[in-house]
């Protein structure tokens, strides 16, 4: 079951409020969700509230942020977002290092074959 942290639309026609929820990828936008992680009201002064520790927990469990939810988390919980980005950079560095090592082994094999 793939999970996403995304915004769920609530409220009235001209006063939309969003909930930040953890939901299955296949559930509809305003459908069933697993856990409420915060809310966002673009019309009020104090316009968001997030549960940072729960967001961090679910991101570590493999949940993915949607683009808009990521922007909200970046604004509301910068520590969580910074740690998420640091993990992504570290993963990319490991992949890059493995790719470099593979290319070096491949070049060595080609040079060895050409020398014969």
UniProtKB/Swiss-Prot annotation:
* UniProt superkingdom: Bacteria
Which InterPro entries does this UniProt record tie to the protein? Ribosomal_bS16, Ribosomal_bS16_dom_sf
Q: Which HAMAP family match?
A: Ribosomal_bS16
Entry's Gene3D superfamilies?
3.30.1320.10
Similarity-based family: Belongs to the bacterial ribosomal protein bS16 family.
Q: What is this protein called?
A: Small ribosomal subunit protein bS16
Q: Name one GO molecular function term.
A: structural constituent of ribosome
Gene Ontology cellular component list:
cytoplasm; small ribosomal subunit
- Which Pfam families does this chain map to? Ribosomal_S16 (PF00886)
Any Gene Ontology biological process: translation
Q: Which SUPFAM superfamilies match?
A: Ribosomal protein S16
Organism of this sequence: Chlamydia trachomatis serovar A (strain ATCC VR-571B / DSM 19440 / HAR-13)
Q: Which gene encodes it?
A: rpsP
Which keywords does this chain's UniProt record carry? Ribonucleoprotein, Ribosomal protein
PANTHER family in the record, alphabetically?
30S RIBOSOMAL PROTEIN S16 (PTHR12919), SMALL RIBOSOMAL SUBUNIT PROTEIN BS16M (PTHR12919:SF20)
The keyword RNA-binding appears for this protein: no
């Amino acid at each position: 079951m793939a999970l996403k942290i995304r915004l769920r639309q609530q409220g009235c026609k001209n006063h939309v409020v969003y909930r930040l929820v953890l939901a299955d990828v296949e559930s509809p936008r305003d459908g069933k969700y697993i856990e409420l992680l915060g809310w966002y009201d673009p019309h009020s002064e104090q316009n968001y509230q997030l549960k940072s520790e729960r967001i961090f927990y679910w991101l570590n469990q493999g949940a993915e942020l949607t683009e808009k939810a990521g922007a909200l988390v970046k604004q509301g919980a910068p520590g969580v977002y910074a740690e998420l980005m640091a993990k992504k950079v570290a993963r990319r560095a490991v992949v890059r290092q493995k790719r470099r090592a593979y290319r070096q082994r491949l070049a060595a094999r080609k040079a060895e074959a050409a020398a014969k």
